[in-house]
Amino acid sequence: MPCSMSQQPNDGSGRAPVAIVRPTTSVTSGVAVTQKLVSAAVAFGNLLKGTYGPNGLDKMLYKTNGETAVTNDGAKIVAELLVKHPAAKAFVQLAESQENACGDGVTGCIIFASELMRESGVLLEKSLHPLVLVKGYQAAMEQTIAKWEENSHSVTLNDDLKLRSVALTAMTGTAIESVGEFLADLVVRAVQHVARQHDNQWVVDTESVRMAKKGTGSLSDTSLVKGIIFDKDLDLEKLPRKLTAGKVVVFSCPLEIEKTSYDAEIEISTTEQWSSFMAAEEEIIKHKAQQIIDSGAKLVFCAETVDKRIMHQLADSGICVLASIDKAGAEDVALATGALMIDHVDSIDEQTLGSFESMTVESFDSSEGLRDRLYLHVGDASGLTTIDVCGGGGTTSEEFVRGLYDALNSVAKAVESGIVSYGGGNQHITAALAVREYAESIAGRERLAI
């Protein structure tokens, strides 16, 4: 009777364990296994080949839950695939490594690795030993790196022309290529803003560049904000919608009457007692609001709720309040403005306040109705910068963001390494010529792999 895959335990006799499998199970070994792995790798490369280069086409991805995406971004395509084959899983890991290391170039990396596997399959069929094959590939890699270093050019943070060219190359073939010149300039300025020098080496934290999706207008309306953007409606109509330069305070705690950590009951027997109780509560509220007013802050961000009475009092004093933002948003405000997140009103002092240049709240129509958008401009001192991506919403804006993200990472890597090279296949051709010339000087079978 056929049974599922099982294995007898080792009885200590030294004999190999016996595997019991279904009659329909096929067992493959030797060169046949290698060819199956090669076939899977080649198939994975062919999946992305149609999206590569300036004439590459987009792919539509459809999930079982109904979500769709139209993209030619290799990292996005690979991330959405359900992969079970061992060789294909290795390629998924390769794509993840490339994305984590460079933030771009996943498609080219996968296609190149796939072609190496294709060639290795042919050579293995001709009985070339795998170790000789690996040695040949390593020799070719060394020649390639040497040639690339020879043909590379230095670049500095202020070399706008070269950095814009890097951004344009990364945008080629993407949805944002049509306004590439304009967006390349935005990307370069964003990188220059967040770049910091450490031990005579430029370090670019791309996480300090935020991408905000406006969902309206055209792609050419995209702008760079030296600060942050919040898509959130104001809680009160009378809150100021425009502020000039001033101070900002960031709270991680709620601005309301503090609740006790245990249940308590208060017995009130007269109207005078009730009036005294309400007056005391009102006094606490006024005191909290007055502390904020006295601090000189013009703008208040709170990661928790804000009592409407406090909000009204602050609004009457010309102070804008944005309440119930997520903690990550509050941390962004603190990072951008130089403020410190505080967990109690009593902690407000000059050292905890941040600074901003201007704040404006704009209202615009969207597919979800009338929306408020708060723009916090901090200026050159801002620890964050935001690219406000316009032009469509949904999958369209997501594809715009992916294209900008690739360009951003490419420019950041160029600044950090201080080296750029020609694009358009130039490096591939020069490396191929150098490797072929080097192979002619090798006499052994290793030459076949090179």
Predicted regions and their residues:
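Core, soluble structural subunits of large cytosolic macromolecular machines
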Residues: M1-I450
